[in-house]
Amino acid sequence: MASMLQNGLLAQYYHKDIASNKQAVKEKNLLQELKIKKVIVHSFEGDRSESGGFFCEKKISKNYTLIETYTKSYISGRSILTSSYNENGLLLQSMDSSDMAVSASQYEYDAKGNILKITSRSHSFDDDFATSLTEVHQYRYDEKNRPVQMLRIRNGKDSALIDFLQDEIGNITDEIEPGINGKHFYYYYDDKNRLTDIVKYNAVKGALKPDFIFEYNRQNQLVKMVAIEEGMSGDYNTWQYVYGDEGQRIIEKCFSKENILLGYFEYEYK
């Protein structure tokens, strides 16, 4: 179960850069509101036994501008995730380092708190070779602070423009990368403007298929996420979330396509 801490399917720019950033800030603000200084994550396997060799602890600074998460497991080794926030609660930098790779992202904002630029650098290495990548995302907004375009630059030379379309309310509905190999993502919402589906064209199946499906409770908390793999198998995992009375996530379970429990996390707050 320890290897499933991070969902590797997340790839859509709007979801990854903007929506997930807002969610991270929201979760940090809740920790600050509840005066929580430490979070311990306990990992369990599908048979409900503890995940051997797993350790995960999140430490929060006194002024809530620095959060360090240390994770160790037999499967993925050791890693440290450091997140820095400014006095307004906006994420400034995140750095994730492990025995095999280091990645860091820096965030720049305009006066209204919109993300203007994200600069990400990653470096991975093993006994045979090392690889490095620098990727910059530059966002442009309309007069209502809604993203309309993003310029992606890889290693200072490979660039592409990503266009965003909106509905009449202002929800992002389409993310379009022009070109033969460009992808077109569709975002769907419920009657409360909550994101319910992220869909793209699946070339293998020749049809529009979802990458993610989301469900919420009456408190607008995410209670279920289905992550679908690409390809012919149509395999997917379902994540279910349980929250405490004060809004903090306390349990996170993962099920297979056959509804078999693969493992789960329990969160302890101090």
Language model feature labels by segment:
Residues A2-L9:
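C-terminal segment of classical bacterial N-terminal signal peptides
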Residues L10-K270:
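Buried hydrophobic residues that stabilize the cores of well-folded domains
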